[in-house]
Amino acid sequence: MSDLKDEIVNKSFFLFLNKGYKACSLKDLESATRLTKGAFYYYFRSKEEILKAGIDKYLSVIGDISETEFLQIGSLKLYIDVIMEQKERSAETLLRMFDFFIIEVAFFQLVLEVSSLFPEYRSRIDELSKGRLSRWEFMILKAKQQGEIDVTLDTSVLARNLMSVSTSMLNIELGTENMSFVFSDMRMQFEQYYLLIKR
């Protein structure tokens, strides 16, 4: 992608995440990038095309560890560490690619907003979320069987609670460069949950 085209995607995607896709006009995008309408149409035929480029760029980075790696994780505590490491690596990669920090939940909200335009992205996010929930449930059951955590806890509820820890980042300003605070806060929340449930 050329530098200018990449800049259009990055600055437009930042606006889409902050204001919402429908709330952003082409004028807003022109203003953010300091380009004319003609320059936009040289690189992109529509606002939808810019959005698609941003979503594709984001999706090229997020994902989960392989099934083989997942099955080798021996404890819930270790799984939490793996999740944290993966989230930090993904966030660093996205920061380099977009020039701003993207909160995962903001991305998911954007995908939900544009699901009528791009239902395939909604399906992909739904699939990703279901897969993550399933893995949390698997690790919780394994931890119960191994005596790592309290067996009386509801597996499904605990899985949803642990999976939602990343939403604690909602109060962080989109685009913040202080990722270390975001991830230390997330790690602290995971640690507190773990202290409450371990045997």
Enumerate the language-model features and the residues they cover.
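C-terminal peripheral helix-coil segments that are non-catalytic and often amphipathic
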Residues: V82-T93, S134, F138-Q145, S164-S168, ...
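Hydrophobic alpha-helical connector segments
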Residues: A53, E67-I103, T155-L162
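N-terminal positioning helix adjacent to the helix-turn-helix/winged-helix DNA-binding module
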Residues: D3-L4, I8-K11
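Helix-loop "lid/cap" segments that line or gate small-molecule binding pockets
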Residues: E85-E88, R96-D99, V105-L117, Q192-I197
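Helix-turn-helix
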Residues: E7, L15-K57, V61
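Hydrophobic alpha-helical segments that form the core
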Residues: I103-L112, V151-E173, D185-Q192
